């Protein structure tokens, strides 16, 4: 079947130029979509891949630390973020791992938490809620692994597509994790270690 381009060689060239421009436009759009910086989290108390700060260690079960939740700062969350959540999980604990902290309903305007935000009441002032961790206490519970190899603690800040999750203070951290997973737009992680 013939097309209009069969009758005018110039049309073929023009069609090729238009096709190339359309493709260039798509490539430019894709590149612009990825031109922004990545969603990241950092702490003044430790660095990714390093050891957790001494002030974050639990104060029980053979550990003698101040048990202060870490300072955290996050940047470049998705533009449509409506709230944030944070978890700290020991991936090397036996069986299913160990939840040290889960926080939800942090307002989207917040970009950092000070050290000890859990015990100091700073999170409550923001309207955030904290889960019951695997030490069976509400709020933050720092690292305190059994003696032996160091454990890895994954700290994750989640950007969520809802203002609040249907959770209540003191519900299990695993339940927080399920609700967070269902509303996540993006996440940023750092991993730190601690051993005795």
Region roles according to the model:
Residues 11-12, 31-33:
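N-terminal twin-arginine translocation
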Residues 33-196:
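N-terminus-centered regions that define maturation/targeting leaders and the start
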Residues 1-13:
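N-terminal secretory signal peptides that target proteins for export/translocation
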């Amino acid at each position: 079947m013939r097309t209009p381009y069969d009758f005018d060689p110039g049309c073929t060239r023009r069609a090729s130029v238009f096709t190339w421009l359309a493709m260039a436009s798509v490539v430019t759009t894709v590149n612009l979509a990825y031109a922004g910086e990545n969603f990241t989290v950092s702490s003044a108390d430790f660095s990714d891949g390093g050891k957790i700060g001494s002030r974050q260690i639990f104060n029980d079960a053979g550990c003698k630390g101040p048990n202060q939740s870490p300072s955290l700062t996050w940047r470049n969350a998705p533009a449509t973020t409506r709230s944030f959540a944070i978890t700290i999980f020991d991936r090397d604990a036996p069986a299913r791992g160990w939840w040290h902290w889960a926080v939800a309903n942090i307002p989207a305007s917040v970009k950092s938490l000070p050290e000890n935000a859990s015990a100091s009441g700073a999170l409550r002032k923001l309207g955030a809620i904290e889960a019951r961790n695997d030490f069976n206490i509400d709020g933050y519970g720092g690292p305190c692994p059994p003696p032996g190899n160091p454990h890895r603690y994954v700290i994750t800040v989640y950007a969520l597509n809802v203002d609040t999750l249907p959770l209540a203070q003191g519900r299990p951290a695993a339940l927080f994790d399920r609700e967070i997973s269902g509303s996540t737009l993006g996440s940023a992680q750092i991993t730190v270690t601690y051993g005795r």
